[in-house]
Each structure stands twice: as C-alpha cells, then as structure tokens.
A protein has these predicted regions:
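Short, surface-exposed alpha-helical recognition segments that flank or form part
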Residues: 9, 23, 46-50, 206
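Conserved nucleotidyltransferase catalytic core and NTase-mimicking acidic/glycine-rich helix/loop elements
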Residues: 49, 181-307
C-alpha cells in the first residue's frame, strides 16, 4: 500500500466504497497513488452547453440541495481573470446541517468529501467534479461560521490555518473575502460593506511579523549551514506572508495565493531566489536582500493606506 503524505487511517475521509482518500488528495488502500484532482489533466470532452446555461444548470441543482441557502461563483471566473480552461469554483452556503450524500446523489462525476474532509477549519470540505466537460469545484460554507468570522474580522481578530497548496496558509477572514469578491448566483448572502479598519491594522502587523520571523529563523539556522532548499522555502513563505501584509494594509481582499505576489508588487523577489547560492555567506546575503525588499513593500503599503 502506498501512502503519501503520512497519516493515520483515522484521519482519512471515506469517499467511495473500497477506497479512502486523505484530505490532501492522495489515496490509501488502492492499487495506485492517485493525485489530487487539481493535478489531473483538464477534461477533453467538449461542453454540451454554453457557459451561462451551464452555470444556471449547476446553480439550480446546488440550490435545490437540502440545507443550502445560497450559491456563489468564486475564483478567477468571478473576478474576470479566467482563461478558457479555468476551473469553475462554486460555493454552497448552508445553514445547520448539510449532508454531502445529497451532493453525491446528483450523480456528477468526481469526488465528494465529507464535512471537514479538506482538513477541517474554515475550509471545511467540498467536491472536485466534472460537469458537462468542465472541471467544477464545489466548496462547503457553513453560514454560522461565516457570520462568526465576519464579526471577528470587524474586530480585527482572525487566525491562520494550513491548507494544501498554500505556502502561507489561509486567514479565517478568507470567508469574508469570498463574500466581498464572489458573484452571488442565488440566495440572500451577507456582503461586507468594506474592509474592516481594525483588520487592516491587525492583519498587516501579523503577516509582516510572521514574515520577519520566518526570515530571521532561516538566517540564524539554515543559511549558516548552507541549506539552500530550506532557505529558498523560507524566502518563498515569507514573500507570500508579506503579500498578505501588503494587501491587508491596502484594504484589499485575498482569496488565494495564485496572484498574491503580483498584486503586492513582489514578483521581483524571483530574482533574489534565482540568484541563490550554496555558500553560507551568500545565503545570508540573499535573505538580507529579501528582508529589505519585503519590509519596504509593507512600509509603502501602510503609507499609502494612511493617506
């Protein structure tokens, strides 16, 4: 039996009879280790209906599921930055109890997780499906949790959770960010009026402090030992943490890391990573350059936000 990454059977989420898939997207007790659906090729079967009819069809089916109070379109397609092969990201907002078996019963091809099947926390599960030839992700959103995190964000309070594919993790105010930028397709969902002033201060300070600590640890421990991989990893994490700090200082919502460095004006960090060397002195210098660039970006964002 192959098992990647390591975990215990009790941590896995049963999805189909005879197989068990860990929230990371890898399979246990199956002949092969299958990758997460996001790593699979884009379906080649041509769509049978145009995009608007497809969206109407999927929305109607999701909205009819027991407990669902609203459906929203997210990701690049909600923000107008998508390409022709981009996934369709949909969120179903439920109140009280939602049973993933009701979604499975629709009969769409793909994998449907249980509640909490993506590691628990605010990103509490969903499905990777193929509908009419289109890769379609469905995210579960508990309205009670959404309202709780919205109230906390207004007070400047939040926490950060790990999530697969995210180097910096995700802030709990992600749920509020989604409501701010996503396109509501049906239902009466809460919409934040603006980026909370207290959150701008607290989130920027938290993310910047985390980035500085990440670089400081790498400079004190990994760089002197010539550990290039660890230094590069710390630098990448710190850059994305700083991206969160910059956008928080500006009062701009973030829903994922895909374009975070571009939006924060930090794509130039690539040149520092590209110039990495194995010698300890060179690695220490590389981290120092990165620290200066990241600190300057946060200072500029805070200055512009204060004007």
């Amino acid at each position: 039996m192959r098992f990647t990454p390591a975990s215990s059977p009790s941590e896995a989420t049963s999805l189909t009879r005879g197989t068990v898939r860990h929230p990371s997207g890898y399979w246990l007790d199956s002949p092969d280790t299958r990758p997460h659906p996001h790593l699979m090729p884009t379906p080649t079967r041509p769509p049978h209906i145009d995009d608007e009819k497809f969206l109407d069809h999927v929305t109607d089916r999701l909205a009819a599921l027991p407990g669902v109070r609203g459906v929203a379109l997210g990701g690049s397609r909600a923000q107008g930055t998508h390409g022709p092969d981009s996934d369709w990201d949909l969120a179903i907002y439920y109140r009280g109890v939602f049973d993933p078996d009701d979604l499975r019963a629709v009969g769409w091809q793909g994998e449907v997780s249980g509640i909490g099947g993506w590691g628990g926390g605010v990103f509490n599960g969903g499905a990777w499906l193929t509908v009419e030839g289109r890769r379609t992700d469905v995210h579960y959103r508990d309205l009670d949790v959404v309202e709780r995190e919205s109230a906390r964000a207004e007070q400047g309070r939040f926490h950060v959770e790990p999530l697969l594919f995210h180097l910096a993790g995700i802030p709990s105010y992600l749920l509020v960010a989604e409501l701010a930028v996503n396109r509501v397709l049906c239902g009466d969902l809460p919409r934040p009026a603006a980026y909370p002033a207290r959150l701008r201060v607290s989130a920027s300070a938290h993310w910047h402090g985390t980035a500085r600590a990440t670089l400081a640890y790498a400079k004190a421990n990994h760089a002197p030992a010539g550990r290039l991989t660890e230094v590069a990893g710390a630098l990448a994490s710190a850059a994305l943490q700083t991206g969160h700090a910059v956008l928080a200082a500006r009062g701009e919502w973030v829903t994922n890391e895909k374009r975070l460095l571009e939006r924060a004006g930090l794509r130039g960090i690539d040149e520092i990573v590209r110039g990495g060397v194995n010698e300890p002195e060179g690695l220490v210098h590389m981290l120092g350059r990165a620290e200066a660039v990241l600190d300057a970006a946060v200072a500029e964002a805070r200055q512009s936000g204060a004007e």
